[in-house]
Amino acid sequence: FLLDYNRPQEVLALLKDWTRADPLLLRLTLAEQLTGANTFREHQAALAARYAAARMRGDTTHEQEESRFTLVVMKQPEEALKLAVSNWRLQREPRDARAVLESAIAAKKPEAAKPVLDWMQQTGIEDWYLRKLVAVLTGGGAK
């Protein structure tokens, strides 16, 4: 929420001591990236190592988070899209849909988001942020 509303300083204050849990460390790292914090590179490397270790164990439970990390922090949209689509096969919540849509936009592969678009239509989900992403994906809005 705070990152979506461009409030990274608040994220830094809230999460600076919460680096053991990967999802919290990701949000801290995203805030550090936005603010240029001197701990950004350290936390970026820590997350990269944790995600690599999880993949070596065959653990795919955090692919949605890893997708966001890969897209936003590592700036690798193609790889982020692969992770998001793989995650979508197992988990279908709005945040998982967001990962696919954001990665598909960044990778310039709107066709990869078709399963999410179908799901949104089938479920009738109403989410302003997902609708905004769909508009960008389909050429009906600017990001």
Give names to the regions the model predicted:
Residues 5, 35-37, 71-74, 107, ...:
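Structural motif corresponding to the intra-repeat A-B loop/turn of tetratricopeptide repeats
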Residues 53, 57-76, 112-143:
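Terminal, low-structured helical/coil segments at or just beyond the last alpha-helical repeat
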